[in-house]
UniProtKB/Swiss-Prot annotation:
HAMAP family: ATP_synth_D_arch. This is V-type ATP synthase subunit D. Belongs to the V-ATPase D subunit family. Transmembrane segments: none annotated. Keywords: ATP synthesis, Hydrogen ion transport, Ion transport, Transport. GO terms for molecular function: ATP binding; proton-transporting ATP synthase activity, rotational mechanism; proton-transporting ATPase activity, rotational mechanism. Produces ATP from ADP in the presence of a proton gradient across the membrane. GO terms for biological process: proton motive force-driven plasma membrane ATP synthesis. It comes from Deinococcus geothermalis (strain DSM 11300 / CIP 105573 / AG-3a).
Length: 222
């Protein structure tokens, strides 16, 4: 970059201002990254808990299903599953976590399986349907939590790349520019000082010469 800038005092001031801005920007991005990392690890715990809950309710639901099939006819089980088939709606909003847009999902209260169960369906089959409704809710929680986790993870990577670009490329480049400009300005100052000293020395020699000549003329007149 040094070859693309004019080594002037105004350029030096501009480079110093750019260095201050870049350094401040890197600090802000690092604070954001640290906050996101803290949020990420908190979400990891939530995601693991959601997965564990899903595994637990799934196991219970399949146990209920096997029991229902043992006590009720396959037709009864199938009829309840068809009766409970409908669109599953969730209340989803978008929230911002340190500038990252993530979904916030609220699961509405669902209708009990007994409310839409056909006639001649046993309690075990109704319980199985209820348990699988709980599984569906657990799946939604897992999806929401892992979506947050993925988006925050992507933002951490993006922020880290920006920090690295500032610290490894931009800031060193600006510092190189400042060193270059200072070097040129210092060299110019030394050259100017040397030139002024030569002029001063020349003027002093001429003055001494004039004084010497004046002294000679005075002696001759006497």
């Amino acid at each position: 970059m040094a070859g693309q800038i004019s080594p002037t005092r105004s350029a030096l001031l501009a480079s110093k201002a750019s260095l201050k801005t870049a350094t401040s920007g890197a600090d802000l991005l690092k604070r954001k990254r640290d906050a996101l990392i803290g949020e990420f690890f908190a979400l990891v715990k939530d995601a693991l808990a959601a997965r564990e809950q899903l595994a637990g309710v799934s196991k219970g639901a399949y146990t209920s299903l096997f029991g229902a099939k043992a006590w009720d006819s396959p037709e009864a089980v199938e009829s309840l599953s068809l009766a409970g088939t409908s669109d599953y709606a969730v209340d989803m909003q978008i929230e911002s976590i340190y500038g990252v847009k993530v979904p916030r999902i609220k699961i509405p209260e669902r209708q009990a399986a007994a409310a839409f169960s056909p006639i001649n369906v046993g309690a075990r089959t109704i319980q199985a349907a209820t348990d699988f409704g709980t599984v569906l809710e657990a799946i939604v929680r897992v999806a929401a939590t892992e979506t947050k986790l993925r988006r925050i993870g992507e933002e951490i990577k993006k922020t880290s790349r920006r920090v690295n670009a500032l610290e490894q490329v931009v800031i060193p480049g600006i510092r190189d520019d400042i060193r270059f400009i200072r070097g040129v300005l210092d060299q110019r100052e030394r050259e100017e000082s040397f030139r002024l000293k030569k002029i001063k020395a020349k003027l002093e020699r001429e003055k001494n010469k004039e004084n010497a000549q004046a002294g000679q003329h005075g002696s001759a007149a006497d």
